[in-house]
Amino acid sequence: MQYTEIMVRYGELSTKGKNRNDFIGRLNGNVTKALHEYKQLRIHPKRDRMHIILNGDDAEGVIERLRHVFGIQNFSPSIEVNRDLDSVKETALAMMKEIGKPGMTFKVNTRRSDHNFFLDTNDMNRELGGYLSDELPELEVQMKKPDITLRVEIRQDAIYLTNQVIQGAGGLPVGSAGKGMLMLSGGIDSPVAGYLTLKRGVDIEMVHFFSPPYTSDNALNKAKELTAKLVPYVGGIKFIEVPFTEIQEEVKHSVPEGYLMTIQRRMMLRLTDQIRAKRQGLAIFNGESVGQVASQTLESMMAINDVTTTPIVRPVATMDKNEIIEIAKDIDTYDLSIMPFEDCCTIFAPPAPKTRPNLDKTRFYEQRIDVDALIERSLVGVKVTEIKAGDQFLNQDEEIIAELL
């Protein structure tokens, strides 16, 4: 079936009032970026929906890209026909012959934006439904929950037919809610937090701490590969590498074992906050889930958050681990996340970290290290790259990956 257009229906944009045009403009930019390889198509954003005119470009490829664009509620590949009833009947019959099977049910659903057309919606439903029923007696008309809904849209320029409604990614257009920094480890939770953050319209930059020689190149590349899994939702993501070796060594040497984790996290948060300020971010996001590990009790969060007044947003804070894992599998980050490459969150991990660290003691022990000097030297070594669609960083050999898992 040769589709001529894809009709895109907006998600939460319909609730955004006077900001609606800004949101549509942002979505238009994101769709344009997602479809940049398709040179023939044209995108026409309207107030109530977006029309992507294919001009011969591959519909299936475009559909696959659109599935990942946040801000789209659903979309329908459509066929344009002339504004006469015979053309509509001919195209509708060909479409139904291709998709219909004996015993299936159908109905016709017409939407008319051009009220000057000689048939209203009910008349078109009856006329076209009756014709198809006569021509295809093996199909049965059914108004409630039919197998096939043939949608007819009557516009001033043409009439459009479709039989599919494909669910989009939902959410808000990425960038419409500002920019934030995501603290990305190599685990399961933070990539899921990144996905959920993007879905709420926040453009994210990844902040990843690495500690060579204690962490390997594979650990760093794993974090980049996890970032690449989220790129289809946005088109490109900045990846910020922050050297953390000296800080971890100094904290381990100077701080009681039970407070190692707390003070390391405070240093990570300070660094992320300074990077955020320099790069005009508005908030910090992470993959913490309340009570999941020692650093994620409310007492630990309070002791760690003490170093900044910047909003810390935790998209998976109230989720069970199984809920997080399900999302990780859906977005294809789970298998990567469980690859056994240690990141800096797991090295030097004390056997019995404080689950309820005392804030005054935390501040006291932290005075044993030169916080400002350590932060300054780490920031000098920060490296920023952009990860784009198709970038690969780990060995893609399936047998090697299977052995790691």
From Swiss-Prot:
Primary location group: cytoplasm
Pfam families: ThiI, ThiI_fer, THUMP
Domain THUMP: 60-165
Sequence positions that bind ATP: 183-184, 208-209, 265, 287, 296
Entry superkingdom: Bacteria
InterPro entries cross-referenced by the UniProt entry: Rossmann-like_a/b/a_fold, ThiI_AANH, ThiI_fer, ThiI_N, THUMP_dom, THUMP_ThiI, tRNA_STrfase, tRNA_sulfurtransferase_ThiI
EC code: 2.8.1.4
Sorted UniProt keywords: ATP-binding, Cytoplasm, Nucleotide-binding, RNA-binding, Thiamine biosynthesis, Transferase, tRNA-binding
Keyword ATP-binding listed: yes
EC primary class: transferase
CDD domains noted in UniProt: PPase_ThiI (cd01712), THUMP_ThiI (cd11716)
An annotated GO cellular component: cytosol
Alphabetical GO biological process terms: thiamine biosynthetic process; thiamine diphosphate biosynthetic process; thiazole biosynthetic process; tRNA 4-thiouridine biosynthesis
Pathway note: Cofactor biosynthesis; thiamine diphosphate biosynthesis
Subcellular location: Cytoplasm
GO molecular function, one term: ATP binding
Catalytic activity, reaction form: [ThiI sulfur-carrier protein]-S-sulfanyl-L-cysteine + a uridine in tRNA + 2 reduced [2Fe-2S]-[ferredoxin] + ATP + H(+) = [ThiI sulfur-carrier protein]-L-cysteine + a 4-thiouridine in tRNA + 2 oxidized [2Fe-2S]-[ferredoxin] + AMP + diphosphate; [ThiS sulfur-carrier protein]-C-terminal Gly-Gly-AMP + S-sulfanyl-L-cysteinyl-[cysteine desulfurase] + AH2 = [ThiS sulfur-carrier protein]-C-terminal-Gly-aminoethanethioate + L-cysteinyl-[cysteine desulfurase] + A + AMP + 2 H(+)
Function: Catalyzes the ATP-dependent transfer of a sulfur to tRNA to produce 4-thiouridine in position 8 of tRNAs, which functions as a near-UV photosensor. Also catalyzes the transfer of sulfur to the sulfur carrier protein ThiS, forming ThiS-thiocarboxylate. This is a step in the synthesis of thiazole, in the thiamine biosynthesis pathway. The sulfur is donated as persulfide by IscS.
PANTHER family: TRNA SULFURTRANSFERASE (PTHR43209:SF1)
Family: Belongs to the ThiI family.
Protein name, entry field: Probable tRNA sulfurtransferase
Organism, scientific name: Latilactobacillus sakei subsp. sakei (strain 23K)
